[in-house]
Structures are given as C-alpha cells and as structure tokens.
C-alpha cells in the first residue's frame, strides 16, 4: 500500500497543487517558498488524525491568501475552505478489508482498485476551523474514525533536534523499538524481574539503609511517641515501558564489542545524530510491519542535508533507497541539495515550480501524439522508447552543477567553458549578475542540448515546466575555416585567400543543429534559440571592429590583443591603411574582423584570459567593448520571462 496521489487546495501558500507519488521514494525539490513544506504538512495532517496527541493542526493562519487586483486596487482574498484529497494504491486483500469504506472499486480491473480519503477544514465566523472528512467516492461516506490509526508516520523537521529525541526519557524512539521486540518475545515479566532484583540489591546497600534510618531517627525526634511514623524506601516504575526508555544510545570507544566507556550523544555531531535517528526510525517501521501488515507508514524528512557534507548526503540517500524496501512504507523528502538531487533518478523527483508540481519522469512519457522530431534531416518522429532513452541520457548528464537548473528561475544553456567564462563577465558589463535573476548557466560540454529540453517543451502548457530557457550555440558554418590554409599569416600575406574565406563564411550553411533545436523547441514560447553567425569568437571580433578605421585601436578588445599579439595588430592596421576611405564598407569590416578573430589565442586560452581582463577592467570595458547582440538577446529573454 502506498500514497499514490495528493491534491492540496487552499492550504498555506498553495492555492491548488496535485501530484502523483512513487511507491517508495519521493524527493520534493524547488526554490524557497514554492510549497515543499506545505506538501509535507498536508500529508502529516492525515497521518495525525488518528493520533491521541496531534503534532500538527490547522489554524486560521493556514488558509490560503492571495492578492487580487480590482481595477488598480489590490485586496487580500482569503479562502475559507481547505481541502486535501489522498489516493492510496497497491492495497493487499487484508488492507482492502480494513479500508473497505475507503475503497473505490473497478469491477473490471481489480488491480485498479484504490482507497480514497478527503479531509477539509472550514473557517466560519472567525471560529476555530471545523474539521470534516469523507472516504470513498460517495459524498458523505465516513469510515470509522478508528481506521485513521492505520495511517502511521514519523516526521523529522528541518529544525529538528535528533539528539534530544534520542535521549528523551519519555517515548524515545529507541525505547519503542526495544519495547516492540519485548512484546513480540513476551518477555515483559522477565525484564521487570531483572529490574526488581537489581533494585533489591541496590536497596540493601548500607548507603541506602543508613539514609533511611537517619530520616526515621529524625521523625522519632519530631513525633516522639505520639505517632508511629517511619518511612521505607523503594524504586518506582519497574514497568517495561519505563525501563526501555532509560536505555540510551551512545558511542562506545570499542566499536567491536560496543560496550564499556564511550562518548555521549551530546558530544557527537548533529549530522551524525540525525543519521542515527533515521536508522532507528527505519528499524521501528520494519518491526511494526512485521507485527501488523495493515497500517501504512510514512517517513517524512525535511532537508536531510542539514549538517551533512556532500559525500555523507550521498551515503544517506543510498541507505534510504535500499533500506526502505519494506512493503507499506514510503519516504517523502524535501531538499535544496544539488548533491542529493543529482543522484536521484528522475522518477523519484517532484519539482514544485510556478504553483504546480511536476513528477520529472512524466516529461518523458506518453508524448508520441506531439510528433516530436529531433533530427530534421531524417524527419523521424520520436516514439516513447526514444524519449525513455533521452531520460536515461539526462540522468547521466545531470551532475551536482547541472542539477542546480531545477532550482533556478531561468536557465541559460551553453556549449562549453568558453561561453561560461565570457558570458558571466559580459553580464557585469550590463551591471548585473546571473544570480541576481536566479538564472542558472548550464554548460552541456558539447551540443547535446536535447535531453534537457524535454523537461521544458511540453505542448500542453499545464504539463510544461514553464521556466524561461535560452540556448546559445554556434551555427558552425564553413568549418574548413579551422584549416591551416586559413591561418592569420596566410590571410594577411595573400588577401585573395582572405576574400575567399569571407565569401565562404557568408555563403556557408548553418549546421542542422539549429533546425533540430527549433524543432525540439516544440513551439514552446518559454524556449528561445540564439545562434551565433559562425562562432562566438567570430561574433566578438565582428562586433568590436569600428566602422571608422581611425577608431580601430580605441576598442577594449583590440587594445587587449595589441598587448598579447602586437605584431598581428600592426599588420591589421597596415592592411586597413590600403582602404580608400576611413569609413569601411560592410565587406571591409568583415574581413578586418576575420583577421582580428584569427589573432585570438586558442579558444579556451582566450576565454580564460580575456574574461579575467574584463573583470579587472570593467569600467574601461564598458566604454568601448561591444557584447554580441545575440548574447544580449538571450540574456534579455531570461530577464523578461520572469
């Protein structure tokens, strides 16, 4: 049995969100304020209904509020009804019997039977919210209230104190596990007798008897012979419940025998104590399921990365993924951790964004009707197995850095490190940083943008993750320009070769990638493709050649190259001196730009050194350096789309 679906309406910051869940592990991600904790609390509300002491309730402050614009006058509109609907699937025959008043039956497909429950809170006349519930598919049907006891959960909040919980003298989690073993073995009387025997030995000690006799001597002096008033001494609470709560975990120095002296948990790190607590909880769930196969257990953990370094986060994930193999138990985790997110399969990730929840694997399922084409030369439509393959590729591509795209407001996809270094510097020329707009720059280290795009290109806007996306790529026309016959020396020494190269670039055909990307874009207006004419470096050179040859050296880029490649810059100046006028034609500018482009060091070296030079001389760069227009357009799309 597992929680398969939830719909939350008008609860806290959520107006309406619905999502499906994985039977075992669910990682809920998203930026701050998107509703992750509200989803967890919505689950907790159901699992608290059957508890004698509820750890969570609904107050007037929990009803959703939103701003409404009425002709320029803004007012706050507060809802008066919270409704949360839960659907459970995978019930055993015994569970279907226990939850019979919850069941929605499909007579044709028994395997499609499911349990349904809705809870609601209504606020009237400012009074405390009125709780109500409905089970099954019939209005007004209410299962026996005691059935709510079959929904069991453990909750570890973001600001939890696991150390305190582990060392509590009442109802501590380790004591619960031990008590369960004791009950199963029917050994309560044996354990209580052990304590009674120990108590008898303790009470027979001279230190205890002398203390008792001293008190009685004083009482005799007070009462004389009027009242015979003496005390005895005993140790209270020899019950198993109190005995096991006195058993506390510690960290023994000898890890082989696990006995004798050791460190107190207060001396341990918060992160490691959190792990101990989680291990104990999972042990308790496993033992409870052995005793009773009817309840459903939910373990809800907020921000498990708290106090854990990245490697230990991954160890925790691997442990949780493997340890939660028990039927009838389910994990729900919220996280901001890119480390954790990068290792979790997409089927276990639920992204909260723009007021909706998206189970990420759904972006790669049941999309054949959209007739997606990735290779426009073959014009072959993608089938569901093709999309599943793209999902597997994406899971391999997403590392700690790339997983940050899921938490961003907008995303800039680029080909490589050169673009990453330069564009980060270019934004500073426009007086902002990418992080100011919560934009994530994703270096795909090549041109394999496609697997990422399927997250954001659904034809149905309701299903789409509607983040603004810009893709910056080269159109890579006339790739022969890399050959040695088009080196700087060849071009400057024989202008006919320069003329040929310019003509070849102008008449060159963009690679099919541009058409392919626009095809995969799938008419989604949140995605825009911005291609360079030729390459980024060619565009940088072209944008920084002034129309007037007299101003050639007044440009920030040219001045930089004059320092590192002074001889070549002098040759370009000599080449321009042959022009009949100071104002250059478009063709002359292009040829000068080609020569300037050919003075660049290697691609990576230029990006590394020039980006540093830009950052060190921002004010000078702002005065004369021109950022290629297609780059600015890509950045503008990301800002305007927010």
Label for each model-derived stretch:
Residues 165-169, 176-299:
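Extended helical coiled-coil dimerization/tether regions that scaffold
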Residues 1-48, 252-401, 420, 615-642:
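Switch/communication elements of ASCE P-loop NTPase nucleotide-binding domains
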Residues 31, 75-79, 110-112, 146-150, ...:
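Conserved catalytic network of the ASCE P-loop NTPase/AAA+ motor domain
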Residues 355-642:
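Acidic, divalent-metal-binding catalytic cores of TOPRIM
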Residues 48-75, 287-294, 327, 332, ...:
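Flexible phosphate/Mg2+-sensing switch loops adjacent to catalytic phosphate-binding sites
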Residues 41-108:
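Conserved P-loop NTP-binding catalytic core
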Residues 83, 89-190:
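Electropositive, glycine-dotted interaction segments
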Residues 80-84, 113-117, 149-153, 345-348, ...:
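Short glycine-/polar-rich loops that comprise or flank the Walker A/P-loop
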